[in-house]
Amino acid sequence: MITRSRCRRSLLWFLVFHGGATATGAPSGGKELSQTPTWAVAVVCTFLILISHLLEKGLQRLANWLWKKHKNSLLEALEKIKAELMILGFISLLLTFGEPYILKICVPRKAALSMLPCLSEDTVLFQKLAPSSLSRHLLAAGDTSINCKQGSEPLITLKGLHQLHILLFFLAIFHIVYSLITMMLSRLKIRGWKKWEQETLSNDYEFSIDHSRLRLTHETSFVREHTSFWTTTPFFFYVGCFFRQFFVSVERTDYLTLRHGFISAHLAPGRKFNFQRYIKRSLEDDFKLVVGISPVLWASFVIFLLFNVNGWRTLFWASIPPLLIILAVGTKLQAIMATMALEIVETHAVVQGMPLVQGSDRYFWFDCPQLLLHLIHFALFQNAFQITHFFWIWYSFGLKSCFHKDFNLVVSKLFLCLGALILCSYITLPLYALVTQMGSHMKKAVFDEQMAKALKKWHKDIKLKKGKARKLPSKTLGVSESFSLSSSSSATTLHRSKTTGHSSNIIYYKQEDEEDEMSDLEAGAEDAIDRIQQQEMQFHNS
């Protein structure tokens, strides 16, 4: 196993640095390797080997640290980053070894001069030259690999192939860096909710959720914040939700109300549960998707290259959809909270304790909360690509090249990308991590490997006790994307149940010794185990 892992890492860095070495610059007609001093070859090889070895050890130390800290989701995200780098290395190898064959592909001259991204003076001159003069002009420019017949041109030149090589490396590196910045800002936002979580240990919070305390529904803080005169009209409802995400994306009442609804639906009363830590783990679990580059995203990258034609202003127009997607997702998330508040008002005139929100997948587009994450992922990739393209143009052609004729438009595009980064990282993604907990199922981020083993062990013990002739009425146990533990008895279910307008009286105890405090994960596991034991006792009594 260790040998396979080392071989994989060695292959990864060979692919990456082999491609990086071939993509660092345009080739020249200098001496071959047989005419190069041996000391020069040895120095270059030593440099590449040392750098690759240091990076490999750095990633390995990071992986070991994540494993010791039980950051399994981030560890999987790191493995996905390695996989993306390996894909990049394979693309690099294909470009390198396929270079002689790609350069031999010729296309008609008319096709070669169509859909150009940059119409330079040389291109205008080429369009006026005769085919024979065009070939002589290209040969004089140093492109000696052209062997096309009269009236044809190479599909892509050697210099263009190396510039494309550099673009692919820029894309992979900037996407990873962009994703890391997004994750850091999101975690910073969620860290600010820790003070709200600590409030749940106070006596004031216990009083606020006391079911013996009657209040009018419209007087509760959550309902007041999300219902007003503008919520009665659909148009103003969404306009209000749109602007709300910029000023008060998540308030204290939002966090405490959604936390109360989540615990009432998925956990037993009286259990200690760190909801803020659970959201942080859930965000880390979603990061595995955000950091990857799917075939759909690669296809969007190719489509952009296809339509990046001179005069179409593709660079500017392509920077608008990511921002619109992020704004639409943020508006939808705010609308979900407002809808839950409206349903409380329509259903109950009086509530006991804290309002109990009823979460469901029906609040989300196509009953799929995961769709919002895919939209965020697409917007982040497109935004990262816009920034990548800007720096690639600057590196390869210069800041004031023909790609940046309208420099004011370029600056506007960069501000849009920066605004989308801040909006998505600090507002939309944390809001998504909170609101999607109101779906129909609990995410697996609440469980770690130790808990999964404990649950499976209990499952196995119960099956052994029952024997082949006896079987529980209904048991579904395991760790998956949505954890479910159901029974024929309505009293022993982890699924969301209908409310009558009052909430459970959840009591929290402060522990004097922090070391003896049961973690939220252990509490969730013990809760599931208790329910299994109850099922077993009910079965024996019957």
From Swiss-Prot:
Predominant subcellular localization, coarse grouping: membrane
Domain notes: The C-terminus contains a calmodulin-binding domain, which binds calmodulin in a calcium-dependent fashion.
Tissue spec. comment: Restricted to pollen, synergids, pistils and immature anthers. Also detected in seedlings, leaves, stems and inflorescens.
Name the UniProt record assigns to this protein: MLO-like protein 7
Residue ranges that the UniProt entry lists as topological domain Cytoplasmic: 60-82, 187-288, 337-374, 436-542
Keyword Cell membrane tagged: yes
Extracellular side, ranges: 1-38, 104-165, 310-315, 396-414
Transmembrane segments: 39-59, 83-103, 166-186, 289-309, 316-336, 375-395, 415-435
Localization, UniProt: Cell membrane; Endomembrane system
Function: May be involved in modulation of pathogen defense and leaf cell death. Activity seems to be regulated by Ca(2+)-dependent calmodulin binding and seems not to require heterotrimeric G proteins. Controls pollen tube reception in the female gametophyte synergids.
Family statement drawn from the similarity comment of this UniProt entry: Belongs to the MLO family.
Provenance organism: Arabidopsis thaliana (Mouse-ear cress)
